[in-house]
Amino acid sequence: MKQIVAFDFDGTLTTKDTLIAFIRYACGFRAFVMGFLRYLPQLVLMKLGLYPNYKAKQKVFAHFFKGMTIETFNDLCQRFAHDNMHLLRSQGIKTLMQAQDDGAEVVIVSASIDNWVQPFFADVTVLGTQIEVENGVLTGRFLTKNCYGQEKVSRMLARYPHREDYHLTAYGDSRGDKELLAFADESHYKPFRS
């Protein structure tokens, strides 16, 4: 039977949320603080479960990146990954590499934007939130649903539709991974914390 090993990215394979780290890296500390202060009410309501996660995330993303060329954005993503490999949890990366060595298909299922996750893992499939680009420019909107909660399961089924044909092992660390962990044959919650 085919083996698939799915990892969440932020908090599972990394030590912090990469959306925040990426914005700070791409825009600088001052712009980062000013942008987050602008959306503080929505972010607080989101944390309290009173405002949808995807809406808050898209508003923040649009504030910082709407109008940027995809070429510039992808260059930032490449540099961010290169300069921030220290964010990766060593035990998580060892587990990922061992799964590959064992012949499993490895996939990262993340609410983060594909563009900055993929450069961390050249030879791993990434199923993340995708951004809309028109005429080479970011619109500030998401092309897909935010890959969070049930959407992680939907993405897995879209990519691997014949569930009975594979054994799924999943790693996650938050409520956004709950459905994926329940969907898996074998699940690991917060596995790489020391």
Question: Which functions belong to the PLM regions below?
Answer:
Residues 2, 9, 63, 142-146, ...:
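Short, flexible active-site loop motifs that bind/organize anionic cofactors or intermediates
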Residues 24-27, 78, 143:
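A broad detector of the eukaryotic-type serine/threonine protein kinase catalytic domain
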Residues 27-28, 32, 44-46, 70-71, ...:
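Short, flexible segments with low predicted structural confidence
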Residues 44-56, 60:
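Cysteine/selenocysteine-centered motifs that mediate thiol-based redox chemistry or coordinate metal-sulfur cofactors
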Residues 1-49:
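Active-site neighborhood of HAD-like aspartate-dependent phosphohydrolases
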